[in-house]
């Protein structure tokens, strides 16, 4: 009970002083997942100390005479260092989350386009202990505390922008062209996040879906900038490494209990599988459900377990925390990626499966439509339904997809029974992703936009 009380205490303190409740709790979950309660309390203390330091320095600025050297020894009126051509990529380079992958792959794209860049870990050394998970990331030497480039590209979501300014200080925003490279999973951009628009000069949207959502909320330029998808071919692991059977076609489905389960719709995926293959003794196919966040959301986990048939040996639940290499190996070892999502901002999981040449069965709605089509994917029909209040933040007035289970069942049967079709779809998928979402292709778009703004 003591640890729970401690957690509630630091959480309340964070919300009271740190701003942005949805962002705060997501950050708390991330810290606690890897560092436990003691790490969580330590992180809160560091943040609070940093905030007090910033507030103190701001107060001091109000009484410092012009030209007078302040306590740091720097003259506030001294000429500033010239800004270099290129961009500073700000985000969570060690984060084991989608936005962490976002900044890492952007670095690859900037490098491929030969655009000068640096990387800034917004929260200092947060996540540094996770560096070994990202052994394939070749730009760790680019991560520094300083970086004076003409452009800043923020690889975080809009709800983190104000908090990022508190951590980084206002100077890093000054005299730079600030770009928010944001994600969002619903069709209407939250009104509560519009203050973030005051901190940027333009927004880059990873998909047309996000582009439209944000463009409806601002007069700032909103530019569609696709995400890069590339990684070393995973090898050295087998199905046995994950305890998976070798004698059947395996569907793969991902979701995280800390990231709003209803959006990913695991119940729909399992229901479709059981309708497609109703005979429990039919060993031609199985479905692997890769889960994260069970320890942080035990009630949701138990409710999910009770909602499915755990006695069916064809439904395989994986709850082990995997490295990036292991995750991609798992995708490679399965036969089809299933995503009966209700909405996706982009859909990196789908894109990575396609990169590996896997047939993808996915809801034909939202961000994934930028790279999934009838020639390279199995797009499932849907109808729009209201998002209920408890299902996602800022749900009021929003709608998302309810995928057609019968249509998904038809595709699932086809990829199992028609090997040629599955292989053809998978090959078209790999060709598309490697052509249009390679670091060089995406980097060319980055360079083109920054050049148009005279920033490179």
Predicted feature locations:
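N-terminal pre-catalytic "stem/leader" segment of glycosyltransferase-like enzymes
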Residues: 3-151
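C-terminal alpha-helical cap of glycosyltransferases
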Residues: 439-456
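Aromatic "clamp/platform" in nucleotide-sugar-dependent glycosyltransferases that forms part
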Residues: 342
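Extended catalytic core of nucleotide-activated donor transferases of GT-like folds
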Residues: 67-78, 88-90, 126-213, 326
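Short hydrophobic beta-strand element within catalytic cores of glycosyltransferases
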Residues: 359-362, 378-379
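Conserved catalytic-core segment of nucleotide-activated headgroup transferases in glycan assembly
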Residues: 101-104, 108-109, 117, 231-324, ...
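A short, well-ordered alpha-helix in the C-terminal region of glycosyltransferases
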Residues: 407-410, 414, 421-435
């Amino acid at each position: 009970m003591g640890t729970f009380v401690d957690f509630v205490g630091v959480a309340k303190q964070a919300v009271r002083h740190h701003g942005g409740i949805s962002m705060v709790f997501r950050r708390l979950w991330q810290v606690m997942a890897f560092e436990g309660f003691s790490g969580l309390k330590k992180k809160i203390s560091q943040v609070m100390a940093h905030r007090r330091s910033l507030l103190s320095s701001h107060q001091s600025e109000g009484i410092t005479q012009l030209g007078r050297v302040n306590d740091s020894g720097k003259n506030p009126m001294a000429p500033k260092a010239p800004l270099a051509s290129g961009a500073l990529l700000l985000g969570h380079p060690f984060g084991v989350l989608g936005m962490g992958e976002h900044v890492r792959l952007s670095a690859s794209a900037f490098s491929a386009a030969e655009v000068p860049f640096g990387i800034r870990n917004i929260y200092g050394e947060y996540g540094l202990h996770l560096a070994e998970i990202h052994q394939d990331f070749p730009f760790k030497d680019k991560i520094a505390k300083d970086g004076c480039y003409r452009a800043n590209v923020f690889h975080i979501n809009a709800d983190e922008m104000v908090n990022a300014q508190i951590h980084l200080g206002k100077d890093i925003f000054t005299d730079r062209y600030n770009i928010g490279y944001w994600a969002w999973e619903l069709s209407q951009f939250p009104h509560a996040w519009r203050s973030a628009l005051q901190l940027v000069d333009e927004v880059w949207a990873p998909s047309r879906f996000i582009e439209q959502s944000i463009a409806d909320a601002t007069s700032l330029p909103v530019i569609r900038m696709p995400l890069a998808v590339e990684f070393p071919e995973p090898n050295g692991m087998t199905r046995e490494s994950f305890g998976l059977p070798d004698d059947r076609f395996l569907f793969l489905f991902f979701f995280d209990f800390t990231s709003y389960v209803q959006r990913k719709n695991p119940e729909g995926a399992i229901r479709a599988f059981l309708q497609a293959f109703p005979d429990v003794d039919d060993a031609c196919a199985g479905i692997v459900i890769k889960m994260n966040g069970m320890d942080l959301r035990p009630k949701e986990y138990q409710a999910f377990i009770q909602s499915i048939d755990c006695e069916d040996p064809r439904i395989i639940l994986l709850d082990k925390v995997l490295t990036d290499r292991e995750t991609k190996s798992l995708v490679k070892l399965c036969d089809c990626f299933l995503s009966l999502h209700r909405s996706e901002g982009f859909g990196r999981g789908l894109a990575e499966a396609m990169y590996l040449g896997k047939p993808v069965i996915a809801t034909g709605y939202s961000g994934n439509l930028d790279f999934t089509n009838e020639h390279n994917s199995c797009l499932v029909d849907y109808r729009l339904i209201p998002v209920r209040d408890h299902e996602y933040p800022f749900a009021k007035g929003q709608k998302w997809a309810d995928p057609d289970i019968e249509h998904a069942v038809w595709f699932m049967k086809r990829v199992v029974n028609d090997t040629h079709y599955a292989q053809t779809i998978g090959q078209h998928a790999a060709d598309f992703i490697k052509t249009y979402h390679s670091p060089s292709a995406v980097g060319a778009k980055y360079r083109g936009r920054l050049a148009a703004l005279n920033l490179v």
